[in-house]
UniProtKB/Swiss-Prot annotation:
Keywords: Isomerase, tRNA processing. Responsible for synthesis of pseudouridine from uracil-55 in the psi GC loop of transfer RNAs. It comes from Clostridium perfringens (strain SM101 / Type A). Belongs to the pseudouridine synthase TruB family. Type 1 subfamily. GO terms for biological process: mRNA pseudouridine synthesis; tRNA pseudouridine synthesis. GO terms for molecular function: RNA binding; tRNA pseudouridine(55) synthase activity. This is tRNA pseudouridine synthase B. It is an enzyme of class 5 (isomerase). It comes from the Bacteria.
């Protein structure tokens, strides 16, 4: 079985727990998830089976959409409710307009400092392991992109909900913390749900608790379909043979569409055969990942 299954992870389980459950149902070992969701978070977690594990890195590049709840006036060491409360402040004077303006100021490409409680490594040691020892180290800010923040609901300063569309590597906990710091009252994430990962959406996900062999076979998505977020180009079959053999082709007759430099495309032969993912540079076009079904 080769393909991707759109799984909905419940709170209270790790992403590896989900993989283990899919392995049991599929009766196969070659299974991997496409981006960790913290145990206290829920939501869309595409899981790759068989040859589809080759495309895990590409699915991880997808834009993600998170539904997040945050509370103003409280800061914890983990930036969420799992941690120890470090400080509390009165946030009742903050107006809705101030909150909206602050939230919207984070849209765009920004520098974000990852939280101490994260799986990132420093000198070979995971940051959360240092944090548990009471050690805080300097973390370099990283460029991330917040594409949009929509559906902002301010029920009270204790409960703000919003949908955040962001790039790979974004820490929503850090976004909540940074919003609180900018408002000078602190903030903590209180709930997190991933509602979309590229073409994989919550409405089409199968709850991991409901997964059966029959459901898996019915809903598994082909490798080709799972890469729908990449633009498609078609090449002549003659050039397709060269690409299959790992040749970098420098010939503009190869494709009819306008092909940008350094952009990944889904590559098809003109007979409809899906070859894989390829990229063009100054020296020609080459398949980066051969994915043809043998």
């Amino acid at each position: 079985m080769n393909g991707v299954i759109n799984i909905y992870k419940n709170t209270g389980m790790t992403s590896f727990d989900v993989v283990a459950m899919v392995r049991r149902v599929a009766k196969m070992k070659k299974v991997g998830h496409t981006g960790t969701l913290d145990p206290e978070a829920s939501g869309v977690l595409p899981v790759c089976l068989g040859k589809a594990t080759k495309i895990i890195d590409y699915i991880m590049e997808n834009k993600k959409v998170y539904r997040v709840n945050l509370k103003l006036g409280m800061v914890t060491d983990t930036y969420d409710l799992e941690g120890e409360v470090l400080r509390e402040e009165d946030a009742s004077h903050i107006t809705k307009d101030e909150i909206l303006n602050c939230i919207n100021s984070f849209v765009g490409t920004i520098d974000q400092v990852p939280p101490m409680y994260s799986a990132l490594k420093q000198n070979g040691v995971r940051l959360y392991e240092l944090a548990r020892q009471g050690i805080e180290v300097h973390r370099e800010a990283r460029k991330i992109t917040i594409y949009s923040i929509e559906n902002i609901k301010i029920e009270s300063n204790d409960n703000i909900q919003m949908d955040v569309c962001c790039s790979k590597g974004t820490y929503i906990r850090s976004l909540c913390y940074d919003i609180g710091e900018k408002l000078n009252v602190g903030a903590t994430m209180t709930a997190l749900e991933r509602i979309q990962n590229g073409p994989f959406i919550k409405e089409e996900a199968i709850n991991i608790e409901d997964l059966t062999e029959e459901l898996l076979e019915k809903h598994i998505i082909s490798i080709e379909k799972a890469l729908d977020s990449f633009e498609k180009i078609t090449v002549n079959e003659k050039f397709g043979k060269l690409l299959r053999n790992g040749v970098k082709v420098f010939d503009n007759r190869m494709y009819s569409e306008e092909v940008e430099f350094n952009k990944l495309y889904r590559v098809y032969e003109d007979n409809g055969v899906f070859l894989g993912l390829g990229k063009r540079d100054e020296k020609g076009f080459k398949l980066e990942k051969l994915l043809i079904e043998e």
